């Protein structure tokens, strides 16, 4: 068989400008007249965006209270002392009182914050069974091996929901009360606990197993709750649309955080007389203290915050834009000085020639 340079092989591409990489190309020549305006314009744009983001973040109001219960920090220290690093006795309660001299504009969001809690630990992050959480009946009885040691109870019953993430579910609870005048009684502020989880989590990723004779409790028969839970998953809420694997608090907790200090949404305040925000007056947050954090050196906070078009309070993004914009301006001036200095030398060299 003779070989021909023009013969097309089985794997030879078409003889086109695209496949043979003969398309026309253009490469800009970055002269000083082009590069310097680009640096200055980019710097001004970044600084403008940074100022807008920073101003918007500073306009967000926040109230926070550390109720970890360190000695001498209020009545929550009594609950923390009773637990001695573990969960305190059931029903231990404390409170936080504060006064608002003016309207706290809404919409107002209630968060809890944990610190020194590494949900991003690999073994912790994979300790779950997504098939079980999606309501698959076979996974309910046979949890994934990743859930170990929270896969089966000591008597052999499968744990539902299994895994370390579910076992460490945050279980403090809060209620907010308002007193308009010193002589008035405290009135409970309605907390909207619905739609606090991501839409995709609540409607797609988390599903309850099929009901048995119309009962969710029968669907979970033959399973055990996680060791740290005081009640089974089907009793998380009396609302049938907010219990089991689709409980909003549970779904929010199961979306793990990337950093050791994180906030999770607990409720919105947007109903009745509080749709525009929190009116002035005295407020009291009643806290049911259940969750132990002192054993791992953590802290827990309750936070009231409103939001802006960019979300919650986060000055980092605005500061980052300001830093990048300032660096662009500084580098532009440095290159301008270098250009002016060495341009004169080039002109002198050309005159000598």
Swiss-Prot record:
<keyword id="KW-0445">Lipid transport</keyword>
<dbReference type="Pfam" id="PF03381">
    <property type="entry name" value="CDC50"/>
</dbReference>
<protein>
    <recommendedName>
        <fullName>Cell cycle control protein 50B</fullName>
    </recommendedName>
</protein>
<keyword id="KW-1003">Cell membrane</keyword>
<feature type="topological domain" description="Exoplasmic loop">
    <location>
        <begin position="55"/>
        <end position="315"/>
    </location>
</feature>
<dbReference type="GO" id="GO:0070863">
    <property type="term" value="P:positive regulation of protein exit from endoplasmic reticulum"/>
</dbReference>
<feature type="transmembrane region" description="Helical">
    <location>
        <begin position="34"/>
        <end position="54"/>
    </location>
</feature>
<feature type="topological domain" description="Cytoplasmic">
    <location>
        <begin position="337"/>
        <end position="353"/>
    </location>
</feature>
<feature type="topological domain" description="Cytoplasmic">
    <location>
        <begin position="1"/>
        <end position="33"/>
    </location>
</feature>
<comment type="subunit">
    <text>Component of a P4-ATPase flippase complex which consists of a catalytic alpha subunit and an accessory beta subunit. Interacts with alpha subunits ATP8A1, ATP8B1, ATP8B2 and ATP8B4.</text>
</comment>
<dbReference type="InterPro" id="IPR005045">
    <property type="entry name" value="CDC50/LEM3_fam"/>
</dbReference>
<feature type="transmembrane region" description="Helical">
    <location>
        <begin position="316"/>
        <end position="336"/>
    </location>
</feature>
<dbReference type="GO" id="GO:1990531">
    <property type="term" value="C:phospholipid-translocating ATPase complex"/>
</dbReference>
<feature type="glycosylation site" description="N-linked (GlcNAc...) asparagine">
    <location>
        <position position="213"/>
    </location>
</feature>
<keyword id="KW-0472">Membrane</keyword>
<keyword id="KW-0813">Transport</keyword>
<feature type="glycosylation site" description="N-linked (GlcNAc...) asparagine">
    <location>
        <position position="286"/>
    </location>
</feature>
<dbReference type="GO" id="GO:0005886">
    <property type="term" value="C:plasma membrane"/>
</dbReference>
<dbReference type="GO" id="GO:0015247">
    <property type="term" value="F:aminophospholipid flippase activity"/>
</dbReference>
<keyword id="KW-1133">Transmembrane helix</keyword>
<keyword id="KW-0325">Glycoprotein</keyword>
<keyword id="KW-0812">Transmembrane</keyword>
<comment type="similarity">
    <text>Belongs to the CDC50/LEM3 family.</text>
</comment>
<comment type="function">
    <text>Accessory component of a P4-ATPase flippase complex which catalyzes the hydrolysis of ATP coupled to the transport of aminophospholipids from the outer to the inner leaflet of various membranes and ensures the maintenance of asymmetric distribution of phospholipids. Phospholipid translocation also seems to be implicated in vesicle formation and in uptake of lipid signaling molecules. The beta subunit may assist in binding of the phospholipid substrate. Can mediate the export of alpha subunits ATP8A1, ATP8B1, ATP8B2 and ATP8B4 from the ER to the plasma membrane.</text>
</comment>
């Amino acid at each position: 068989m003779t070989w021909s340079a023009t013969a097309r092989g089985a794997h030879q591409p078409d003889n086109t400008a695209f496949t043979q990489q003969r398309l026309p190309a253009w490469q800009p020549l970055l002269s000083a007249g082009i590069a310097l305006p680009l640096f200055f314009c980019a710097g001004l744009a970044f600084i403008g965006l940074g100022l807008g983001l920073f101003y918007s973040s500073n306009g967000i109001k926040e109230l926070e209270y550390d109720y970890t219960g360190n000695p001498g920090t209020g009545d929550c220290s009594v609950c923390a002392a009773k637990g001695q690093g573990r969960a305190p006795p059931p029903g231990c309660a404390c409170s936080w009182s504060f006064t608002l001299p003016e309207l706290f504009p809404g919409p107002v969001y209630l968060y809890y914050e944990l610190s020194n809690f590494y949900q991003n630990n690999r073994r912790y992050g994979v300790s779950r069974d997504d098939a079980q959480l999606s309501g698959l009946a076979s996974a309910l009885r046979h949890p994934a091996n990743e859930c170990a040691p929270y896969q089966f109870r000591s008597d052999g019953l499968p744990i539902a929901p299994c895994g370390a993430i579910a076992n460490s579910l945050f279980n403090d609870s809060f209620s907010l009360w308002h007193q308009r005048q010193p002589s008035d009684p405290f009135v409970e502020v309605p907390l909207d606990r619905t739609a606090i989880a991501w839409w995709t989590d609540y409607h797609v990723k988390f599903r309850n197993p099929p009901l048995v004779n119309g009962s969710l409790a029968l669907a979970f028969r033959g399973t055990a709750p996680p060791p740290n839970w005081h009640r089974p998953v089907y009793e998380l809420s009396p609302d049938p649309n907010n219990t089991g694997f689709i409980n909003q608090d549970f779904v929010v907790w199961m979306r793990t955080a990337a950093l050791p200090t994180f906030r999770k949404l607990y409720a919105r305040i947007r109903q009745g007389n509080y749709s525009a925000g929190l009116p002035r007056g005295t407020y009291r947050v009643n806290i049911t203290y259940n969750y132990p954090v002192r054993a791992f050196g953590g802290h827990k906070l309750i936070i009231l915050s409103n939001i802006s078009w960019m979300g919650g309070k986060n000055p980092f993004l605005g500061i980052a834009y300001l830093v990048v914009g300032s660096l662009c301006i500084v580098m532009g001036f440095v290159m301008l000085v270098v250009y002016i200095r060495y341009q004169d030398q080039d002109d002198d060299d050309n005159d000598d020639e």
